[in-house]
């Protein structure tokens, strides 16, 4: 992902309330390995169910606020993240919902999908043994991940 500044992040959110923006925690941007990320995703340390996802769409940073469901999937079964398509224990995948942008979202309309609980999909697609993930495979998985994140974000931005 192209590096993001705090100003990029704060101005990017399409479905955040003024209160959410005022309380928005910014992750340690100086620690980011931008070349190893397709999007920036993080959880709010003060609001355990809240998370944030920022990606670039057509040279514009677009951010969405997501909320995890209160419960989790049943332990002992496998689940798959709809972003990175990585199968993993069900306890590591969570249903997240996001309010639609604009009046539609203010009226309570949301969209949900299953995502890695820590929003660390960019790292997960890179954590297989090297012989199973040559650079070309990682690039292909990264492009597919970014496309799915952008599609979900575009759905959030639809107001009808």
What are these regions (language model features)?
Residues 1-62:
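Charge-rich, low-complexity N-terminal segments
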Residues 56-70, 96-102:
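Short Cys/His-rich Zn2+-coordinating modules
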Residues 66-77, 106-110:
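Short, flexible, mixed-charge glycine/proline-rich loop motifs
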Residues 81-85, 116:
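Short cysteine-rich clusters marking metal-coordination/redox-active sites
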Residues 86-90, 121, 126, 130:
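Short functional micro-motifs and their immediate structural scaffolds
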Residues 97-113:
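Short linker/helix segments within small regulatory modules
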Residues 113-120:
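Cysteine-rich micro-motifs
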Residues 126-159:
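Polybasic, low-complexity binding patches
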């Amino acid at each position: 992902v192209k590096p993001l500044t705090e100003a990029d992040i704060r101005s990017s959110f399409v479905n955040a309330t003024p209160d959410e923006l005022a309380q928005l925690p910014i992750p340690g941007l100086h620690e980011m390995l931008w070349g190893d990320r397709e999007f920036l995703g993080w959880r709010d340390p003060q609001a355990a169910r809240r998370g944030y996802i920022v990606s670039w769409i057509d040279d514009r940073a677009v951010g969405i606020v997501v909320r995890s469901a209160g419960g989790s999937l049943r332990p002992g079964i496998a689940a798959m993240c709809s972003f990175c398509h990585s199968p993993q224990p069900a306890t590591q995948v969570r249903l997240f919902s996001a309010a639609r942008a604009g009046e539609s979202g203010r009226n309570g309309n949301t969209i949900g999908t299953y995502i890695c609980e820590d929003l660390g999909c960019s790292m997960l697609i890179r954590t297989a043994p090297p012989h199973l993930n040559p650079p070309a495979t990682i690039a292909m998985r990264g492009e597919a991940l970014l496309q799915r994140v952008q599609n979900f974000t575009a759905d959030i931005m639809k107001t009808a």
